[in-house]
């Protein structure tokens, strides 16, 4: 059995719930939003700021520049902090890690199972409406917006670590 399990997922697919249940069944630590909390403590940035930076990874150059304190855009600082946390957690022992491009960050990690959870759009819309209380007239746009943001985040991480 692999020591580390990374789970990527589409918004509304139930991936986080599946990951949490898997970690409980295997009796190993589960990391999802806890990664943001750890990265916030290590960088001195607030959890809210890190979440905002994740949402803006591909957008404004001026946004990145205006909040940068170490000659790196804030998006890069956040990615580096999260990647460091993911690598350290993986080195500490078996666990389930959800999102944050953990599958890519740990691409060279041996004994790591990488899983991606997806579901039909109609099921994801229904789940988002029921679990998150998103109004019926907004839920489809919300699901698609999250899909687009996650794809942009993942592409940002790939580009950030790719050799020039």
What are these regions (language model features)?
Residues 2-4:
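Pre-Walker A (Motif I) flank of P-loop NTPase domains
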Residues 7-18:
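Glycine-rich phosphate-binding P-loop
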Residues 20-26:
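A conserved segment at the C-terminal end of the G1
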Residues 30-40:
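Short beta-strand-centered segment that lines the nucleotide-binding/catalytic pocket of NTP-utilizing
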Residues 40-94:
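ATP-dependent small-molecule kinase phosphotransfer cores
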Residues 111-129:
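Conserved phosphate-donor/acceptor-positioning beta-strand/loop module used by diverse small-molecule
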Residues 142, 148-156:
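C-terminal accessory "lid"/substrate-recognition subdomains
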Residues 160-164:
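Conserved small/polar residues in nucleotide/adenosyl-binding loops
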């Amino acid at each position: 059995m692999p020591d580390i399990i990374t789970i990527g997922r589409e918004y509304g697919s139930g991936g986080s719930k599946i990951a949490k249940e898997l970690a409980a069944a295997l009796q190993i630590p589960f990391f999802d939003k806890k990664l943001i909390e750890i990265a916030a403590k290590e960088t001195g940035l607030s959890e809210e700021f890190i979440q905002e930076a994740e949402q803006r990874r591909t957008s404004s150059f001026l946004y990145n520049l205006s909040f940068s304190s170490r000659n790196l855009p804030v998006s890069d600082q956040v990615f580096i902090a999260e990647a460091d946390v993911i690598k350290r957690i993986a080195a500490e022992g078996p666990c389930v890690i959800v999102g944050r491009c953990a599958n890519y960050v740990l691409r060279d990690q041996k004994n790591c199972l990488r899983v991606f959870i997806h579901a039909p759009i109609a099921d994801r819309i229904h789940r988002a409406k029921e679990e998150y209380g998103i109004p019926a007239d907004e839920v489809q746009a919300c699901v698609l917006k999250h899909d687009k943001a996650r794809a942009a985040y993942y592409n940002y991480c790939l580009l950030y670590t790719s050799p020039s």
